[in-house]
Amino acid sequence: MIPMLYHNVLPEAEEYVKSVEAGKFEDIQTESGMFKKIQQRGEDALYSLVSHFMPEYEIVMNFVRKSPLGQKEPNFIHTDEMHGDKTLIYYLNQTYPEGYGTTIYDNNDIPILIHRAQFNSLFMFDSGYKHSRNIEENFGEGEDARMVQVMFLKAKSNE
């Protein structure tokens, strides 16, 4: 799959972000390690949209991650293949530091695609692709901390 980018994803994105910010963020242990400061989202507006446009996939994880400046993460360059077939990243911050976004790498960890984040945009790619956020140390504090919604999708079987 060629990575895909969508802009203006949700019609009322500002209200959506307010609902996210009103929720609780917590650390959750998963089979691949500790997910810090996440909020599980369940069947929210983005879930409904993705389910409608990608009915051949099941959404197996749907969460928002808040990552303030200096928050240590277990991995920088990594894959998500243990979680699903597709990774979706929805950008929730109104503004970003220069150059922030997501980078996809080749097998030698050489950047081959650099995406610059924009509010209310969604970046989708195969979960087996090596990738990272563009700023390793994260950014912001409080309401200005890095905030992305992540979904992992698995292809439904044709049985």
Question: Model segments located where?
Answer:
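Catalytic core of non-heme Fe(II) oxygenases with the double-stranded beta-helix
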Residues: V60, S67-E159
